[in-house]
Each structure stands twice: as structure tokens, then as C-alpha cells.
């Protein structure tokens, strides 16, 4: 007999996302409670996936006018080509289309050449325009072309060299991961009378191409997909007994859970942390009440209003006798109506 104890293990009922001074790049994610030992298990797994497996964009090769190889120097340019390439590796990019794509740069001295001088086109965003690439003396000029592609993890320069590479094309080591740093710690936390559950705290820094909370969500999805391979049994289907359904006093759509809506990770987590489970809970909230929710901003509010409008609903509605005492049972009975 299969021991289905996974149904009995405690799952986190609290997920906090605390943005840093730059919410696009820094955040602390706290999940609790977890079974004893699961903080270390999940923290280590999430950290490894965050650092190695998320997709990002990076420069794969560069061409500089008048330069044949990376051990050259350029007249009037203070940095040698090796240093310029090291700076190019630090470019933070967001690619909005399938690669590879091209960027270019052309500038005359004197002055500092930064990432903001790059002409990237509509498909590429340069996220750190203040990054210094090189310095030009009076009368000096530099022209460069970059190849940008999507990938994951680290790819050495020799793997970025195409077979038909023209003379002067210099492949670059590519670090695709949009996540720069991840650390985690595990502490004890209390749930009811039990004092030794785990509390997992993740500190995440990205390059701005992805928010830390989205990065965690994608990493968790990767783990979920990989672990599904090891589930080698089928769970028996529960037999549903047809019963007469009582007539509802409200729209059956209110029984739908908010985590089934197509919301962003940030919006979904804000609702979860505010104990908003069903759409019926959500629509009774006013806009001002929602905006007082921690980490919930105008962008999330507009997103939720748009989703509700598609269902013919809006915030600030009144639902008499909500929630019904048998809400979970009703939600199962009427799930074919929403």
C-alpha cells in the first residue's frame, strides 16, 4: 500500500516577499512553516537552480574595427582589448525575441564609452547603461558590433565560436544567468504548539532582467517539472457521486480560488499573504483596502481589476451571507460552472 504521507506534511502558509532598495533587483523571500529539514533541502535546491538554470541574454561575440584578436591594443584607447572584453561580459541585457541579435557602438573621443552608447534596437534592452566599456583619448574612435543570444548558465568562449567565423570575430565567455547572487538561511519557527518547524529565508540579487520573486517562481517550476519524472505511480481517481446541487444565492464564479487566475507572481503572493482565497473574498475588498496590502501597488491593482472585469465583476461588491459555511464543498460541486 502506498503511504500517501505527502498529504499530511505541513506546507508553507506564509510567503513574504520583501523588496530591497531596488525592487527590480533585490528582494528577500521568506517561506514558513516547513517540515524540519525541508528548509535546507529546498533552500539548497532553489539556490542551485536560480544560479544555473534560468534563461537570460548575454553577448556571445564582439567585433572591433581594426582588431584581429583579443591580445591587441587600439590607438587612442586607454584599455587594451582584453580589458574591454572583460567589461563587455558585465553587460546586463534583456532580449525580447529569439536570438541571436546584433548591437553596435560607434563613438569618437575624447571621453568615456559606456553601455548607454550602444545602439541596441527594439529587441534588446541594455539594463546597466552606466557600465564603462573603455576610455578614448582626443582624436580616437572606436566601432564595435556585438552578437547577443539567449541561453542559460555559463558558456565558454570556445563554444561561442561559429564554424564560419570571419576574421576579427572574437567569441566571449557568456554568463547568461540573470541571477547574480543567492544566499539562504534556515531558522526555527513556530506553528501552533510545534516549535521546531523550519523557516527559509532567501536573499536574491538579479541583474534587473527579471525580478527576484519571478526568479524564485521560475526556479520552483523547473524543480517541479524535473521531480515529476520520479513520480512513478498513478493516484487513484476519486469517485464523484452526482448529487443534487442547491441553488446558489450568488454567482458560482465567486467560488473560484484566486490562485487559479492568471495573475503575476507578485499579485498572487500579495493576495495569498492577505488571506484572500476565493474570488468572493476578493471582490468585497475596496481599492483603498487593496492598496494598503504590503507590497501591493497600483500595477497589481490594475491587473486584478482587468481580470475581474473580464468576468463581469469588480472590487467593492457586496455579497450577502459570504462566505458560506460549506464553501469548500460548494466549490467542488460548482467547479464546472466557472
UniProtKB/Swiss-Prot annotation:
Any Pfam family the entry gives: RNA_pol_A_bac
Segments of this protein annotated with the region Alpha C-terminal domain (alpha-CTD): 250-338
Ranges where the record places region Alpha N-terminal domain (alpha-NTD): 1-234
Keyword check for Nucleotide-binding: no
One record GO biological process: DNA-templated transcription
EC number assigned by the record: 2.7.7.6
Gene Ontology molecular function terms on file: DNA binding; DNA-directed RNA polymerase activity; protein dimerization activity
Catalytic activity: RNA(n) + a ribonucleoside 5'-triphosphate = RNA(n+1) + diphosphate
One Gene Ontology cellular component: cytoplasm
UniProt cross-references to NCBIfam families, sorted A to Z: PRK05182.1-2 (NF003513), PRK05182.2-5 (NF003519), rpoA (TIGR02027)
Record-linked HAMAP family: RNApol_bact_RpoA
Assembly: Homodimer. The RNAP catalytic core consists of 2 alpha, 1 beta, 1 beta' and 1 omega subunit. When a sigma factor is associated with the core the holoenzyme is formed, which can initiate transcription.
Protein name: DNA-directed RNA polymerase subunit alpha
The organism of origin for this protein: Parvibaculum lavamentivorans (strain DS-1 / DSM 13023 / NCIMB 13966)
Amino acid at each position: 500500500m502506498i503511504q500517501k504521507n505527502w498529504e499530511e506534511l505541513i506546507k508553507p502558509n506564509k510567503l513574504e516577499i520583501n523588496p530591497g532598495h531596488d525592487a527590480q533587483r533585490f528582494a528577500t523571500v521568506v517561506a514558513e512553516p516547513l517540515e524540519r529539514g525541508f528548509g535546507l533541502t529546498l533552500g539548497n535546491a532553489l539556490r542551485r537552480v536560480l544560479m544555473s538554470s534560468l534563461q537570460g541574454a548575454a553577448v556571445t561575440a564582439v567585433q572591433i574595427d581594426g582588431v584581429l584578436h583579443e591580445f591587441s591594443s587600439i590607438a587612442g584607447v586607454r584599455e587594451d582589448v582584453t580589458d574591454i572584453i572583460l567589461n563587455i561580459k558585465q553587460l546586463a541585457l534583456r532580449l525580447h525575441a529569439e536570438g541571436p541579435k546584433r548591437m553596435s557602438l560607434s563613438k569618437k573621443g575624447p571621453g568615456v564609452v559606456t553601455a548607454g552608447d550602444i545602439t541596441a534596437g527594439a529587441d534588446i534592452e541594455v539594463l546597466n547603461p552606466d557600465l564603462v566599456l573603455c576610455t578614448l583619448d582626443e582624436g580616437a574612435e572606436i566601432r564595435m558590433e556585438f552578437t547577443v543570444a539567449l541561453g542559460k548558465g555559463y558558456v565558454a568562449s570556445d563554444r561561442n565560436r561559429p564554424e564560419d567565423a570571419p576574421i576579427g570575430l572574437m567569441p566571449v565567455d557568456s554568463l547568461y544567468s540573470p541571477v547574480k547572487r543567492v544566499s539562504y538561511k534556515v531558522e526555527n519557527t513556530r506553528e501552533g504548539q510545534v516549535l521546531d518547524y523550519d523557516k527559509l529565508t532567501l536573499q536574491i540579487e538579479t541583474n534587473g532582467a527579471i525580478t527576484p520573486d519571478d526568479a524564485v517562481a521560475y526556479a520552483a517550476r523547473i524543480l517541479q517539472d524535473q521531480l515529476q519524472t520520479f513520480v512513478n505511480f498513478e493516484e487513484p481517481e476519486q469517485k464523484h457521486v452526482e448529487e443534487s446541487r442547491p441553488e446558489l444565492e450568488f454567482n458560482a464564479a465567486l467560488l473560484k480560488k484566486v490562485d487559479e487566475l492568471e495573475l503575476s507572481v507578485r499579485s498572487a503572493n500579495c493576495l495569498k499573504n492577505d488571506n484572500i482565497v476565493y474570488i468572493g473574498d476578493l471582490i468585497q475588498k475596496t481599492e483603498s483596502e487593496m492598496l494598503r496590502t504590503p507590497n501591493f501597488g497600483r500595477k497589481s491593482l490594475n491587473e486584478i481589476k482587468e481580470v475581474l472585469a473580464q468576468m463581469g465583476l469588480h472590487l467593492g461588491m457586496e455579497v450577502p451571507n459570504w462566505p458560506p459555511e460549506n464553501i469548500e464543498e460548494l466549490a467542488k460541486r460548482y467547479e464546472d460552472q466557472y
